[in-house]
Amino acid sequence: SMNNFSLILRLTFGKTRILLPGDTNRAGYGGIPPEKLAADLFKVGHHGQLDGADAALVNAVRPRFSVCCASSDRRYNSAHPDTMRLLKDSGAELYFSDCPPVDGQSIPPHRALEFTICADGAASARYLP
């Protein structure tokens, strides 16, 4: 898939790591040692489609926060329920670029997500109205 030519970028600020895999699906991570994938904030690859993450990838990343950029109409199965459940079951807090109901919880209308990362490694996230 051409999506697997996406740049996989991991940023580190103090003790906080951010993994930005672009449109990569799980096959695109081949050859990257699992310890290089560990991240506190994970932008889910391939818009959270079913091939965007699997258990092995989620176990390697171990995210505290996961962000899924998906279309509100869920075209192409973005933010696939199985992928979101896998991330949620791992303990990650889920955030979305749109406002879908997730497990019965509504997400407030928003225009942006704000992640605050402190030098001591503390991090928080919130939607901006």
Pin down the residues of each PLM region:
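Binuclear metal-ion centers of metallo-dependent hydrolases, dominated by the metallo-beta-lactamase
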Residues: 1-3, 65, 72-129
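Active-site-proximal loop/helix segments of hydrolase catalytic cores
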Residues: 1-79
